């Protein structure tokens, strides 16, 4: 009985530790080219843009979407936390559009530094970064 209680306490401590570790991860923020007039997007609009179903900003300007590789931890966190989808679901949507000829996949970058550089230099660009990679060459877009 004592062993069972110890095992349960150990499991609870491990779960609490995992939750604390996840909470310590920096947030992944939606960022855009500084020339974009939109300052806020809904989750549905953001999801539609990243699924490549919506190709323009609300003001009509073309959106250029940038993403990290599917196996990048920041991409996985952004997809799950901000878009409420799994990375493989996004990939399936992109593949479907490419193979059917109705659209194209987003632009891939390999690092957050490259993401920041490409967003800063591409009019209409949209992507995501952890806070530590932000600078005055990109703007944060809030999501509600």
Predicted regions and their residues:
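N-terminal secretory signal peptides that target proteins for export/translocation
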Residues: 1-4
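Flexible loop/hinge segments at secondary-structure junctions
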Residues: 23-144
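Bacterial N-terminal signal peptides
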Residues: 7-17
């Amino acid at each position: 009985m004592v062993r069972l209680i110890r095992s349960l306490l150990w499991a609870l401590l491990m779960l609490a530790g995992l939750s604390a570790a996840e909470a310590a991860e920096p947030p992944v923020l939606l960022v855009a080219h500084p020339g974009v007039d939109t300052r806020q997007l809904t989750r549905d609009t953001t999801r539609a843009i990243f699924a490549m179903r919506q190709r323009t900003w609300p003001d009509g300007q073309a959106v250029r979407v940038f993403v990290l590789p599917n196996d990048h931890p920041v991409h996985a966190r952004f997809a799950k936390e901000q878009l409420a989808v799994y990375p493989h679901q996004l990939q399936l949507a992109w593949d479907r559009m490419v193979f059917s000829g109705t659209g194209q996949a987003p632009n891939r970058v390999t690092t957050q530094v490259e993401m920041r550089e490409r967003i800063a230099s591409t009019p209409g660009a949209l992507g995501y970064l952890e806070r530590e990679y932000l600078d005055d060459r990109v703007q944060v877009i809030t999501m509600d």
